[in-house]
């Protein structure tokens, strides 16, 4: 019995038709693990940064028709929410588990906060080859950093700084069949390794 990780069949919750039925599937197959990950990693971030972090599991409460295509737990230093702050995420689409750190378009003082990525441009480029960027958290697309030109990356960061709807995340994503999802130990090790790479961008 696993506590934190996800099986390939859990991702099939996103194939369930209809809002109520899909929410029921998410509640059964995915949300229990997200709550456990929320407890584990809010403690992890608190111990790593010296700031108190709170977990926020997606509720999808505003939806009335369209079922969610993704779900997540986010970590930020506010009990009230995470969207206004730089934050960490563990989440899922039907074809991927993703891990991210960055800034949404709704963030307070977004232009100033996003400049951390401008200052640490070289550090982004030096992340391992399987690290990615996400420029729209609502879409599954996450190009590999190694596949972007300097100009592509600079433009993406500038968009987050200057455009109202712009956002920027550094990310990592694996498939539902990935061996790092086979056990809690392997999954937690993967997540901790990823967040260790992200933390210097938070504290910069």
Swiss-Prot record:
InterPro entries according to UniProt: UPF0637, UPF0637_domain_sf
Phylogenetic lineage: Bacteria, Bacillati, Bacillota, Bacilli, Bacillales
HAMAP family the record matches: UPF0637
Name of protein: UPF0637 protein SaurJH9_1166
Species of provenance: Staphylococcus aureus (strain JH9)
Family: Belongs to the UPF0637 family.
Pfam families: DUF1054 (PF06335)
């Amino acid at each position: 019995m696993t506590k934190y990780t996800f099986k390939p069949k859990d991702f099939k919750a996103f194939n369930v038709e209809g809002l109520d039925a899909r929410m029921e599937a998410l509640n059964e197959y995915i949300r229990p693990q997200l709550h456990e990950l929320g407890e584990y990693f809010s403690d992890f971030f608190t111990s790593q940064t010296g700031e108190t972090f709170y977990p926020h599991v997606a509720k999808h409460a505003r939806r009335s028709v369209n079922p969610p295509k993704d779900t997540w737990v986010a970590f930020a230093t506010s009990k009230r929410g995470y969207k206004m702050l730089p934050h960490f995420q563990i989440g899922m689409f039907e074809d991927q588990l993703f891990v991210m750190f960055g800034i949404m378009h709704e963030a307070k003082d977004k232009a100033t906060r996003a400049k951390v990525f401008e200052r640490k441009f070289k550090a982004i480029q030096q992340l391992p080859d399987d690290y990615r960027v996400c420029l729209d958290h609502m879409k599954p697309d996450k190009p590999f950093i190694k596949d972007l030109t300097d100009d592509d990356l600079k433009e993406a960061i500038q968009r987050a700084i200057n455009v109202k709807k712009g956002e920027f995340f550094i990310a990592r994503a694996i498939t539902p069949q990935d061996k790092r999802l086979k056990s809690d130990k392997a999954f937690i090790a993967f997540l901790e390794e990823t967040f260790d790479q992200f933390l210097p961008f938070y504290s910069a």
